[in-house]
Amino acid sequence: MIYIITVFLAGNPDDSSMSAYFMDRLKNNFTITYLNNGLVRQIGKGPEILLIEEEKIISENINNAVIVFKRDCTPLLSGKFLKENTVIISSYDKSNLKKISGQNIETITCGSSPKDTVTYSSSDDETIVVSLQREITSFTNKAVLPFEMPIKRLCDDDYNILAFFALSVKIGFTEKNSL
């Protein structure tokens, strides 16, 4: 059975900092098919990830996907998300959190609050220690219990690192696979 993980990066498609970081981190373990503004690019080797950068999200048409809201994004949302999806969002994004609140969808918040699903406990110029605060069920239906893990700081945006870590946990690419 061929299984493709679909990931939408919601927000301005001209801001490619998140997609560049995600692709760079995943390309050694996954085949990534990247779609953005008519551009199609494929890199890497391994299980398939479809990475779509899009400003307009027609949520009722998306099924079994991860929707990652970019920092400071204003995606054009249409409809309610289906419960089989997962949203990864900054806890500082109050506007979009309000739009998805009350929907029966797994929401993973990322930020510096102890209430966030994914946060960090320490940070320096080279490493950020990321923390999963609550259990997440991966796409393989494996319960991933809270844990901490140091990650090399390969980008300057802490939210991109936290969102990548959340996605990694969701797709089963966790502590056994060095990030």
Language-model features: locations:
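Short, low-complexity, polar/charged sequence segments that are solvent-exposed and flexible
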Residues: V68-D72, T86-I88, T107-T109, E126-V130, ...
